[in-house]
């Protein structure tokens, strides 16, 4: 009877361990899935630009921003929970999505400038300045501000006679 109880206890422990490892692996998988999703959107973004489909590229980047927004919601719901590295992983995913979207907007601004669509380029850079206001996003704002100043060189204001 003691052997049977010990065997059952061992099996229960093994099942519990397997369940824990599976859940840990699922947690890791969700982060990989998010990274793959961002990567897919980035590839589609650049493919659309390559084929001069600006509106489609914008939608791809908006999808990355939407993922970032969802992650922000997840983090804000979990912020009061002590404990796991889950929030840290969520923050990493959030930062990755934000930085990727900001870089894509900057690339779109450059693309539009090359295509001599200066007003759209300027608006794209202004979007970076207006949207990415966090302290960790300062670099992107500064790049966008410099790009706007560079656009002023390419398209000076009309002179008044």
Protein language model features and the residues they cover:
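Short solvent-exposed coil/turn linkers within tandem alpha-helical repeat scaffolds
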Residues: 32, 67-81, 92-99, 130-143
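Bacterial Sec signal peptide processing site at the extreme N-terminus
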Residues: 23-44
């Amino acid at each position: 009877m003691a052997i049977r109880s010990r065997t059952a206890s061992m099996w229960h422990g093994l099942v519990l361990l397997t369940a824990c490892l599976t859940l840990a692996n699922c947690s890791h998988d969700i982060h990989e899935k998010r990274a793959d999703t961002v990567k897919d959107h980035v590839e589609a973004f650049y493919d659309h630009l390559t084929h001069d489909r600006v509106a489609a590229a914008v939608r791809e980047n908006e999808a990355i921003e939407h993922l970032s927004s969802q992650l922000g919601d997840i983090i804000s719901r979990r912020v009061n929970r002590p404990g796991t590295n889950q929030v840290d992983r969520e923050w990493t995913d959030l930062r990755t999505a934000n930085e990727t979207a900001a870089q894509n907007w900057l690339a779109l601004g450059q693309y539009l400038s090359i295509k001599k669509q200066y007003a759209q380029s300027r608006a794209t850079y202004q979007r970076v300045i207006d949207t990415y206001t966090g302290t960790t996003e300062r670099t992107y704002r500064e790049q966008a501000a410099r790009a706007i100043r560079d656009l002023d060189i390419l398209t000076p204001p009309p002179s008044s006679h």
